[in-house]
């Protein structure tokens, strides 16, 4: 696989980044969207999984999780830190995700955490098309966008959320939720937008129940 331009600077800093990534929890990172994620057991794909913090947390909750990470050094750290988690690691990268698309599996939840900003705007259409192909009917796409100055040696683009929302709509993905939050690592100049989309369900097919919806159904009503 050709090394994606967006991974520049990550391989050589993998060990230091692991400390940073693992210093915050899955619950903290996903708090704005988590209640709208599918209830377990669901099929989950974490793209740009880094050190596997989120993938391992979701697997521990009972989901079937695939972690896609194109940087070998980060992938190796993740496999070491979260050995025995049940996460299946693969090598693939946006914008086209050729291996995952060719595999044909579809997912109830696709995570794109701190990844979208590494793609140039002209890569977004093909990336969104690939993401849509990987979503099951009524599947959900959780995407975060970083805003702020670009660190030295990294390839990032500080873009507003609106073009991404419009592009997702063009691919049949409905915006379910939008939120903003401060940076969890205390960088005052950095903030984040969190977006959750849903793919249209097939006619007559059962919808994917979210955590909050599942919690509303008590044992006596199931």
List where the protein language model places each region:
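Conserved acidic residues
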Residues: 108
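Short, conserved loop/helix-junction motifs that constitute active-site signature segments
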Residues: 133
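Short catalytic micro-motifs in class I SAM-dependent methyltransferases
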Residues: 114-115
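Class I (Rossmann-like) S-adenosyl-L-methionine-dependent methyltransferase catalytic domain
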Residues: 1-102, 119-126, 130, 140-222
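A conserved beta-strand element that flanks and buttresses the S-adenosyl-L-methionine
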Residues: 111
């Amino acid at each position: 696989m050709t090394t994606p331009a967006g991974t520049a600077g990550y391989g050589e800093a993998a060990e230091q980044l692991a400390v940073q990534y693992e210093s915050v929890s899955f619950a903290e990172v996903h708090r704005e969207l988590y209640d709208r994620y599918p209830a377990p057991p669901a099929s989950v794909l974490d793209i740009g999984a880094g050190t596997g913090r989120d993938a391992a947390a979701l697997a521990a909750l009972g989901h079937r999780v695939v972690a896609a990470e194109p940087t070998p050094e980060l992938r190796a750290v993740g496999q070491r830190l979260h050995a025995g988690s049940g996460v299946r690691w693969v090598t693939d990268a946006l914008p086209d995700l050729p291996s995952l698309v060719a595999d044909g599996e579809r997912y109830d939840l696709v995570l794109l955490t701190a990844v979208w900003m590494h793609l140039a705007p002209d890569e977004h259409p093909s990336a969104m098309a690939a993401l849509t192909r990987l979503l099951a009917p009524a599947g959900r796409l959780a995407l975060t966008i970083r805003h702020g100055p670009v660190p030295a040696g990294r390839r990032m683009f500080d873009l507003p959320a609106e073009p991404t929302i419009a592009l997702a709509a063009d691919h049949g993905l409905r915006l379910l939720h939008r939120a903003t939050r401060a940076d969890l690592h205390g960088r005052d100049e950095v903030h984040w937008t969190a977006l959750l989309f849903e793919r249209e369900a097939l006619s007559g097919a059962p919808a994917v129940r979210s955590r909050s919806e599942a919690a509303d159904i008590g044992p006596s009503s199931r």
